[in-house]
Amino acid sequence: MLTANPPSRPLDLLSDRLGLGTQWEIEHDANGRFEIRHRDQGTPYRPASRPLQWAGLLNQLESGFRAAGVTRARPLPMRWGRDTELTISAVQAVDPLLKDGKPYVFRRGYLPQPVVRLTGERDHVGALREGFLTSFVNVSRIEPVTRTAEFTGIFDHWLTLLSGIGLHARHLTIHGRNAVWQRREVCGLTVHFRHLDLPIGDIVLLWNAADPSCMAVDLGSGLERLAWARTRRPWWELAFGRFATAGVAADVLDAVRTATLLVGNGIAPAARGAGGVLRRILSAVPVDAAPLGVSTLVRASHGFWSLTSPMALPWPEVAFVIEREIHRRDVTSATSLPLPRSSWSDRT
């Protein structure tokens, strides 16, 4: 049972082994940390020989959720404006319940939500590390719940769904710490999962600290990470396709891809607010990185984002806004630079 002061009384989700059967082996220490592995964990993993197209993977996920009676919710708007300027997680759909103690949520069910996060891990020179992007599709299931037992049911279904896309239980590790955390008005307990050595998401039981009856489950992964786990293809090739071999830095590709999502959702560059975040992201694109434009990359990115989020602007308008912002900084120097050896523009 959740109490009004949950951090002082940790919730023991291991008391029923997270609802897992006897084929799972649990190890835990005195600090509450635990790892759960399948008893057949030593079997080799063979990556999918034929990677699914993005639409195919999304369709498989949606079908798996639908089979359990979980319907797909429409995406949240990219402009958030509450605690963050942009939507950074699908869990923001339950903000009214968890943060305000209100008896409603914005969305529930299966939610493939495009998100933007500026917190991706970077190396010593500031470049994004493999496995991280500024924007990605947060594959989520968001559910208000009334009993903690619903948590284990949602988790069990997720394991079944992962198996359906080729990520079988014997290659998964479930781990976490059996202790409650608190961040401002929200408390939670998090269980992580990884496929072999690759983290692929988590499931969190969440509740309002002042009113624990306001409770929800947030199951989250990333579409790109799931595809990476399935195929074990090189990360940048998976994320950017043919553009990864065009001689352009991954951070530049990432910035244009993210800007396409934001501009396509009606956010324009500005001095502050959501537009300020967009301007900051595009500052990573040097004027000489794309002297002939970014239209081909924008078109491909626009098609990707359109799979999960209807775009307010067509791709040619998005490309125009992005190019105008890139060249706003230094039009003279941009037009005087020589052409690069390769380009990712429609106009080459």
List where the protein language model places each region.
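Structured aminoacyl-transfer and RNA-binding surfaces used for tRNA recognition/handling
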Residues: 2-279, 289-306, 310, 314-348
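Alpha-helical interaction elements
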Residues: 286
